[in-house]
Amino acid sequence: MKMMMIMKTTLLLISVLLTQALQSQGRPAIQDEAPAEPTSYTLDSGEKLELSCKAKEDTQKVTWTKDLVPLVDGEHTRLRNDQMEIEKVEPTDSGLYACFAQGLNSNHTEYFNISVTDEEDEVDSSSEEAKLSNDQNLPMAPVWAQPDKMEKKLHAVPASKTVKFRCQANGNPTPTLKWLKNGKEFKRDQRIGGFKVREHMWTIIMESVVPSDRGNYTCLVENRHGSINHTYQLDVVERSPHRPILQAGLPANRTAVVGSDVEFECKVFSDPQPHIQWLKHIEVNGSRYGPDGLPYVRALKTAGVNTTDKEMEVLQIRNVSLEDAGEYTCLAGNSIGHSHHSAWLTVYKAVPPTQLPNQTYLEVLIYCVGFFLICVMVGTAVLAKMHSSAKKSDFNSQLAVHKLAKSIPLRRQVTVSVDSSSSMHSGGMLVRPSRLSSSGSPMLSGVSEYELPQDPRWEVQRDRLVLGKPLGEGCFGQVMMAEAMGMDKEKPNRITKVAVKMLKSDATEKDLSDLISEMEMMKIIGKHKNIINLLGACTQDGPLYVIVEFAAKGNLREYLRVRRPPGMEYCYNPDQVPVENMSIKDLVSCAYQVARGMEYLASKKCIHRDLAARNVLVTEDNVMKIADFGLARDIHHIDYYKKTTNGRLPVKWMAPEALFDRIYTHQSDVWSFGVLLWEIFTLGGSPYPGVPVEELFKLLKEGHRMDRPSTCTHELYMMMRDCWHAVPSQRPTFKQLVEDLDRTLSMTSNQEYLDLSVSLDQFSPNFPDTRSSTCSSGEDSVFSHDAGADEPCLPKFPPHPNRGVAFKKR
């Protein structure tokens, strides 16, 4: 409970708030230095505590506080200006200590987390042993003294916490205690910072735990009469390193009448415990801002020791008066940084009820509204009819099939490259009609059979195909592994492993149309080394089978994850051994191959719309192949594709114009490629870690971007940032990306394998960053803020010269 209280008060904004409290009300604060992370100390009862406040300049005054309460010099706590001493600490001395040093030009703040071990456990242990010695002196094998306190085996704690495991036991002679981690002896040099073992308390203590501390911890207790053991499982939850995120639109502007009640709400998302405060902007001598540009504010509501975050997220104003009108700010901060949103309260006097309009006016209004509604309904019906006709015409002109008299005619386009030799013939409707059974599917029960054309260039006899195990399910069908004979025309007896796409048992007519459409699209696109290629199809005398290349190593995301080096913070599995080492060259090669595949698809006028590591497959020879491109739409005659149906959207991979306007272009695919690059260099990490999807929209509009992965060079990160440019036309083309990655691949071809213990800047040439970042923030390590004067991503504020720097100068 003490640690929870300490984390709750570990905040960046305490210095600002206390400085304002110490000054006269309404006076703007001196600009503060950004405080560092709190320093943590753990002491035993009776030890001496000495803390020192080290300011960068001569200080005029130093103030010490404990849990936000000012300390005074006394017998127990001695204060010597910039030093604080407690000769013998007690458990009640645990808490968050802070020193505030006021200087001529700035204020300096330091925080200290102090934890004093309670001796109660030791007393309990001693009393148990004394009782045992009095009651029994006979030889006895070890037994647990307090088994009820050992029932909780799984302990999930946030990073930086202190963890204690206890295995108190009785026995005669007194048993010995040994600790194991993951079945092996646990030694102090195996952990950064070591650990403490208190034999008399049967306890192991690990301070400031990190993700690499995850695992199974076993206490082995034994004497010459026997042994017992108990295992605790520790899971360290990594914190999401970013400042608080406030929900967009909150608090909202309010309008109230004198005497009524008003509520402002502020929704805060933060992994480190946030500190929330409500402020009201005031005027001093007719001005709302001080000489340094900071606003005059008055604290209305501040978190106390027993105040919950939910209570702090709501500000209630009872019996509103005209003086309550003005600007209110929700200020939230943690150890990483701070955020704020403001709203206005407008107060009116009670308005007397207005006289009701006469009967004639009401009748005219009713007639006008009725006429308007009728016009709207007629217009809507006409537009819907026109849209339906246009959609039907477009559907007939596409590669997709449409049913007419129990036949599915296919119309092929001829504006394709010679690589797709099978599609060079101008489109007749049916080459050679043949019936395709629906297999009695319940969804296709109304249509017992379909007629599909036979394409001799791609047709594969069913007796040459042996289906194997399922590989997965797609949006309208399933994929099976299979062995096919005769795929290689030069070696007709050779057996090849393939993947077969087919419909599920509950498929609809549209599902069949989509599968055929994808097959025809793959025929037209042609073959390329870095895409999944069509090998053939079974369209006659049975269900439709679409035969494509088989990728033995699955998708790129899982391929990277199983090859993470031990100790990487994204994943921990003590029993997992990396399949093979990954080098910088390997990662760049993955990106280069995907870029080549996308360059080819772009040359064929195909937009992927769902480019991500999960949609890139890896062959046995580590060749990257882009999958599901057959679902893309042909855009020979238009420059963009606007999605008009609502479905599951991969929002964390989507460009802003696709998210907000549903416009898909090659440039939106480039944005997705930038996110895929981030996935590659985090070895399968999840984009925007710790950020709720509903907050992603606002953050992207404000120009936030993900930070550089630790295994990524500066040049490659600049490539990602180019892909994430707010203006689509300013993003690179896939042709340019292929050229840049080719150059990078040649420069990194002889580098060593990944070493996560050192910085990877050594792999990057001297690559100057010429990008301007007029509003970048170093306080947010999940995103970096990139916005320029010509980019439509600047935050929108009411016109005031000092808005946007309300609480801290940049």
From Swiss-Prot:
Q: Where is the signal peptide?
A: 1-26
The UniProt PTM text for this protein says:
Autophosphorylated. Binding of FGF family members together with heparan sulfate proteoglycan or heparin promotes receptor dimerization and autophosphorylation on tyrosine residues. Autophosphorylation occurs in trans between the two FGFR molecules present in the dimer and proceeds in a highly ordered manner. Phosphotyrosine residues provide docking sites for interacting proteins and so are crucial for FGFR1 function and its regulation.
Provide the transmembrane region boundaries.
364-384
Cellular component GO terms held in the UniProt record: cytoplasmic vesicle; cytosol; nucleus; plasma membrane; receptor complex
Q: How is its activity regulated?
A: Present in an inactive conformation in the absence of bound ligand. Ligand binding leads to dimerization and activation by sequential autophosphorylation on tyrosine residues.
Q: So what EC number does this one have?
A: 2.7.10.1
Glycosylation site list: N107, N113, N216, N229, N253, N285, N306, N319, N358
Query: Which InterPro entries does this one have?
Result: FGF_rcpt_1, FGF_rcpt_fam, Ig-like_dom, Ig-like_dom_sf, Ig-like_fold, Ig_I-set, Ig_sub, Ig_sub2
State the family it belongs to: Belongs to the protein kinase superfamily. Tyr protein kinase family. Fibroblast growth factor receptor subfamily.
Q: What does this protein do?
A: Tyrosine-protein kinase that acts as a cell-surface receptor for fibroblast growth factors and plays an essential role in the regulation of embryonic development, cell proliferation, differentiation and migration. Required for normal mesoderm patterning and normal skeletogenesis. Phosphorylates PLCG1, FRS2, GAB1 and SHB. Ligand binding leads to the activation of several signaling cascades. Activation of PLCG1 leads to the production of the cellular signaling molecules diacylglycerol and inositol-1,4,5-trisphosphate.
Protein's recorded name: Fibroblast growth factor receptor 1-A
Q: Which organism is it from?
A: Danio rerio (Zebrafish)
